[in-house]
Amino acid sequence: VSAALLAALAADLTTLHQRDLEPIDVAVLDSGVDSSHPALAGRVTSSRRVEDGQPIDVEVPGNNDTYGHGTGVASVIARIAPNARIVDLRVLRPGNKGSGEDLVAALRIAVRARIKVINMSLAAPAKFAPNLRPLCERAFYQEQMVVAARRNMPIGDDGFPAEFASVIGVGRADLPQPVSLLYTPRRSIELDAPGDAIPVAAAGGGYTEMTGTSFATPMVSAVCALLLGAFPTLRPHDMRTVLCAHGVRGG
C-alpha cells in the first residue's frame, strides 16, 4: 500500500482546498465553456471545438459554449478545486447535439495530451463503446482519471464510457453539497454525488441551478483534482479506493 494512498484515505476532503496544492489539468468534454465568465476568470487554459473529428482552436477568454451545459460543469470544478486548470474541448454543437465520432476524437486528444482528469458529463450509446473502451483503458494505464456521467434515465445500460471498469462512473443522489459521496457496492456505477439544484455559472453571464448526473460528475472530477493536487502519486485504482472509502455506504 502506497504512502499516498494511506494519506489520502486519512485526509479530510472538506479541507483539502485549503492546502498548498499542485495545479491539475481537467479536460471538460462538453458543449464548450464560456471562459469570459467571472466564475472562470483565469481558470481556462485552452479552448477548442472538435468538428468532424478535427480540433479547432478558440480564443481565450471568450464564449465557446452554445448551450450552457459545459460552462455549468466547468464552474462546478472550478468552485470546488481551486487548483484545477480547465481544458475546454467542445464536442457538442448548438442544441446540445453531437456525434459519437467527435466525442471519440476529443477523448483521443485528451488522452494523448495526458490530461490528468477528464470530465465527461455525457453518455454515448453502446455502439460507440468499442471505440471509447481502448482510449479509456489507455488513459487508466497512463494514470489519467476519466470521470463520466451515468445516464439520467438508463435505457438498457448506464451509458458509455461510465460503465467501463477503467472509468469512474458517477450517478446522482440527494446528498449535502459539495463533496459528499455515496458508495453502493456491486453496482455497475458505484459512486453517486450531489446532483439536484446545483448552483452553476451560466454561459453569457449570471448564475443558475442545474440538476442531473451531468452536475454530479464534475463534483467527483473536482475531488480527484484536489486529491491529485495534494497526493500527486495517487494512481487511478488508488483514486477509486479513496473515493469509495470516503463515501457513505449505500445499498
Which positions does each model-derived feature cover?
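Extracellular S/T/G-rich loop segment that most often corresponds to the catalytic His/Ser-adjacent loop
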Residues: G159-G229, T233, H237
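Gly/Ser-rich catalytic serine loop of serine hydrolases
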Residues: V60-T71, M153, T208-V220
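Mature extracellular/periplasmic domains of secretome proteins
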Residues: L16-L21, R79, G98-N119, A129-M145, ...
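Subtilisin-like peptidase catalytic core
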Residues: E59-K127, F231, L243-G247
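Structural detector of well-ordered beta-strand residues that form the stable sheet scaffold
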Residues: V87, M145-V147, G169, P199
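Active-site core segment of subtilase-fold serine proteases
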Residues: S2-A84, V200, G204
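Solvent-exposed loop/turn segments at secondary-structure junctions
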Residues: V33-D34, P94-G95, A123-K127, N152-I155, ...
